[in-house]
């Protein structure tokens, strides 16, 4: 009997569900009446009552149009909303990144990706566009020279660093059509190969590596990413590595570097416990090193480095240890954070010490290779003079050290010619420096002869061909050094000396501009050194044609000083007999103290040589100045 009632209830419930009307309210009342009638049919069977109640609940859930309560949402729909809520309220969005003024859009896109998608923290941006202030370089690193924006960020691990670079590179390719490059930790496969090689060496190393492996998941990692876009560089470091390197001090403005100084606030015990996890023979040494570790600034002061360090590197240089010396120099440069110009000046000072100490046994090819290894491929225009000055000083020291192995021709090629072919202008000071080296080498060599002058003259002509501006002949210092390259003594000098003097006189007459006093003095000095008195008096008379009353611009005091120094009895007698000194009275030349002293000395020398000078002396020294 109970089974029959239960089956009839199921059939009626199915019929009610199948033929229920469209009205949700009517269906709801119909179902309630049906359930109430079934409850009164049997009050003794709890099984039927529970079944009917269960079926009534199912009927209520099937009614989609009911107004009493809404149906619950599936769990997967609630997860979508939950993810959006997390994205909108993530802690990474709370980072405040300060952008430099006039930042490019590419920088903003990169920072937003690092911050929101890759989960990097502590993001700092340093603006390196203003590289110089008052001709002084603001940043000590070479990377700052080619970078406009330096980004520093912190990752959670080495894996995180590597993943960030991969994702950043993908974005660069897709959005900016640029492929970034990275320097820093190698990938995990290369790291495993490295560990296998190290493990083969010694048992001690193998055991220490087994207990303290340094795989690519280590916590000390640094990736430097060149975005190849708007000169943006991104540094991705782990927390410990960032604290150790303290790159902020390198790229911060000078006025802000102090706040990035490293503060070793952690105790030595805490540090030693952190790094001595392995129970091996090196742990004790590691603890001692950590206890003695001090906080140093990452900025090096090149001026504090003694040239003796580089001198020691260059002193024992030979063909066999060249590669070792090059490595030592690179290590010194890296450890001291030396720039290219600092290293070049460092080597120039060391070469000067070699020259002063007469270290003749020097491997010159190796010495040159060491200098050229530090010479930049692209010389910055802003401070190019410093680079060429360092190069000139270095090769000058090489020539002074051993002229037989490093000749003047080598200096000309490595300094002047290379500067010209590098796209830089050969200036007057470059030629003046070269001519001074030429003239000093001629005078210092006791065996110098006319053929040495010919060789020197060939180098002079080659150097002059590097200059296109003819206005250089107006520079008295340049003419002085040029004439000195043509004179050894009164018996050994080049005929080109007279050609230059004639050209200067001709150019002065053509332009109707008188030669300046310094230029006249230089020519007189050169002619007195070679003791060509006829040429000297010819030149002096040409100058006298342009002199007139109270307008005699010739340097009489200097002229007499050189005559007194280089002249002889014949010269003194010729000057008295030709009446050259009478032009002092005729043109009313002012008798300055210097001129009076030189006249007195001239008359004294002439009297000692038996030349009558009393009449001329009285006429000149006792002459009264004419009224104005």
From Swiss-Prot:
Topology within the bilayer: Peripheral membrane protein
Biased composition (Basic residues): 194-203
Database matches in Gene3D superfamilies: Beta Polymerase, domain 2
One term under GO cellular component: mitochondrial inner membrane
Subcellular location: Mitochondrion inner membrane
Any one of the GO BP annotations: mitochondrial gene expression
Residues of the transit peptide: 1-40
SUPFAM superfamilies xref list: Nucleotidyltransferase (SSF81301)
Record's keyword terms, sorted: Membrane, Mitochondrion, Mitochondrion inner membrane, Transit peptide
Biased composition range(s): Polar residues: 209-218
Region (Disordered), start-end ranges: 187-218
Function field: Probable mitochondrial mRNA stabilization factor.
Family affiliation: Belongs to the ATP25 family.
The protein's name in its UniProt record: ATPase synthesis protein 25, mitochondrial
Gene name per UniProt: ATP25
